[in-house]
Curated annotation (Swiss-Prot):
<protein>
    <recommendedName>
        <fullName>UPF0473 protein EF_1204</fullName>
    </recommendedName>
</protein>
<comment type="similarity">
    <text>Belongs to the UPF0473 family.</text>
</comment>
<dbReference type="InterPro" id="IPR009711">
    <property type="entry name" value="UPF0473"/>
</dbReference>
<dbReference type="Pfam" id="PF06949">
    <property type="entry name" value="DUF1292"/>
</dbReference>
Amino acid sequence: MTEHNHDHDHEGHEHITLVDEQGNETLYEILLTVDGQEEFGKNYVLLYPAGIPEDEDVELQAYSYVENAEGTEGDLQQIETDAEWDMIEEVFNTFMAEEEE
């Protein structure tokens, strides 16, 4: 389980700070969120390290999550099933196709 806090900058990018087991904080940008409530009973987020130039390849990270009532903190969980990964991959591919248009 990884803790996270949301932060918003003035450029319109939403950020999230991940805190690992040793207490190290790493800033990530949120690429997109996926509503999986109807199918899986949880939501998902795709992240990449903040500050990476747009033309550079990045490794995306995907998690399921549940936010607190204020929507400012919550717990990220590892994605557990192939069905969840398939749904996230489909949403990501659609997102990328729309971005290229």
